[in-house]
C-alpha cells in the first residue's frame, strides 16, 4: 500500500516543485506539450516523466473535502470578519470556528471549512491569509 505525505516544498529538492510547475503549465494550456513545459521551468523531460505520477499539489488528484487552519490574530476589530469574507468569496463553506479569548493582544482561531468548491488553490489562500493585515501566523492543521 502506498503512503502519502504532505511535505512543505521548502525542504524538497527543487525538481519536485518544477515538476508541479510544468504540470500546471500543461493543465492551463500555457505550454503546448511536455517538451515546452519542461523547457520553461528548467528541467529535463526525463525528470518530468520520472516524477510526474508521484508529485501532486495539495488538492490535485485527491478528494479532500475539509481543511482546518489555525490562525494567530492581532486583537483588532474586523480581522476575523475579513478572513470569513475571503473564505466565502472563494466558495469555501465554514463548518466550525473556535476562537480563544485574546491574550497579550493576540487570539488563536481555528477554522474548519469545506474546500471542495474553492475557486483558488489552498496554497494560494494560505499565502493570502499570511499577508493579510493583523494576521500574525497561519498554519494548516489538517485535511480530510
Swiss-Prot record:
Residues 68-143 form the ACT domain. It comes from the Bacteria. InterPro entries: ACT-like_dom_sf, ACT_dom, UPF0735_ACT_dom-cont. Gene3D superfamilies: 3.30.70.260. HAMAP family: UPF0735. Belongs to the UPF0735 family. This is UPF0735 ACT domain-containing protein NT01CX_1681. It comes from Clostridium novyi (strain NT).
Amino acid at each position: 500500500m502506498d503512503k502519502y505525505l504532505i511535505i512543505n516544498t521548502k525542504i524538497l529538492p527543487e525538481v519536485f516543485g518544477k515538476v508541479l510547475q510544468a504540470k500546471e503549465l500543461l493543465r492551463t494550456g500555457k505550454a503546448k506539450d511536455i517538451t515546452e513545459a519542461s523547457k520553461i521551468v528548467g528541467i529535463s523531460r526525463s525528470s518530468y516523466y520520472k516524477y510526474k505520477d508521484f508529485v501532486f499539489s495539495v488538492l490535485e488528484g485527491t478528494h479532500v473535502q475539509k481543511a482546518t487552519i489555525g490562525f494567530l490574530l492581532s486583537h483588532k476589530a474586523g480581522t476575523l470578519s475579513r478572513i470569513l469574507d475571503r473564505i466565502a468569496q472563494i466558495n469555501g463553506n465554514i463548518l466550525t470556528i473556535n476562537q480563544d479569548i485574546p491574550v497579550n493582544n493576540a487570539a488563536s482561531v481555528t477554522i474548519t471549512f469545506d474546500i471542495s468548491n474553492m475557486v483558488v488553490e489552498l496554497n494560494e489562500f494560505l499565502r493570502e491569509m499570511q499577508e493579510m493585515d493583523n494576521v500574525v501566523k497561519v498554519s494548516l492543521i489538517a485535511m480530510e
